[in-house]
A protein has these predicted regions:
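Signature of N-terminal electron-transfer/Fe-S-associated modules in redox systems
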Residues: 1-142
Length: 142
């Protein structure tokens, strides 16, 4: 960051502010599987605290720490834009949605074993429409 500040002729604090504000910048090493748990209001109301509990149990008690095998790390983040599928988490570039504590633990164990499970809804949702919403073609999707 000091190099970037010097290169851009700006104060170091300005570079630091950007690097610590955006979750896509990491100030310490992350695992092969980087888990971001959404804890904004919609996800929290629907149980994201259970996802955090699962991460603490299966990966590391502290955010940002690597798992014992070094493959996984996790953090809490603000809205990931999939509120209708709450609670959810992003693993690398993929969204895992409609989660509960048990499903989250299964996903985390699969990552620790380097055999990731399929991303998407874990409740059988076919799209991200609200529950019982009918598409313009008349099909109901849950």
């Amino acid at each position: 960051m000091k190099y970037i500040a010097k290169y851009l002729s700006m104060p170091y604090i300005n570079v630091y502010e950007v690097a610590t504000f955006y979750t896509m910048y990491n100030l310490s090493p992350v695992g092969k599987y980087f888990i971001q748990v959404c804890t904004t209001s919609p996800c929290l109301i629907r149980g994201s605290d259970k996802l955090v509990k699962a991460c603490k149990e299966k990966i590391s008690n502290e955010m940002g720490e690597l798992s014992k095998n070094g493959k996984c790390s996790w953090i809490e983040v603000e809205c990931l834009g999939a509120c209708v599928s709450a609670p959810m988490m992003q693993i690398n570039e993929d969204y895992y949605e409609d989660l509960d504590e048990t499903k989250t633990k299964e996903i985390l164990v699969s990552l620790i074993n380097d055999k990731p499970l399929k991303p998407g809804s874990y409740r059988g949702r076919k799209n991200t429409s609200p529950e019982k919403f009918k598409n313009i073609d008349g099909d109901k999707h849950a």
